[in-house]
């Protein structure tokens, strides 16, 4: 793994991460662990799992920070870490909300009809 290449991200409030590969591996693994608790047929799990596995494979395969940033196409690795933290929070909320379950009550017949 390449050492720290910069002293600042140039983004207010976003500090440089000294171990971005390790941090991303941990976050992506946690996301996948949470997704395991969501049914396999849930769209959120299916697509998020696919994207997260792809990103995790890139992190494991590319030791160079700059090349990894280019592959992930999410900005600086610190920004990618922030995105992964947000995805982990969302995955936990999706697990809690159980959006794959049927609605408690039927929606109104013309709920999505427009114009009224």
UniProtKB/Swiss-Prot annotation:
It holds the Pfam family ETC_C1_NDUFA5. It is a peripheral membrane protein. It is found in: Mitochondrion inner membrane. Keywords: Acetylation, Electron transport, Membrane, Mitochondrion, Mitochondrion inner membrane, Respiratory chain, Transport. Complex I is composed of 45 different subunits. Belongs to the complex I NDUFA5 subunit family. This is NADH dehydrogenase [ubiquinone] 1 alpha subcomplex subunit 5.
């Amino acid at each position: 793994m390449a050492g720290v290449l910069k002293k600042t991200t140039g983004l207010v409030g976003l500090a440089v991460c000294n171990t971005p590969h390790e941090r991303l591996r941990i976050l992506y693994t946690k996301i996948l662990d949470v997704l395991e608790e969501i049914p396999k047929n849930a769209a959120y799990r299916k697509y998020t799992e696919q994207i997260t596995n792809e990103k995790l494979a890139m992190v494991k395969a590319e030791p160079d920070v700059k090349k990894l940033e280019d592959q992930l196409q999410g900005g600086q690795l610190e920004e990618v870490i922030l995105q992964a933290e947000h995805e982990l929070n969302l995955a936990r909320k999706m697990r809690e909300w159980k959006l794959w379950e049927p609605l408690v009550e039927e929606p109104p017949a013309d709920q999505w009809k427009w114009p009224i």
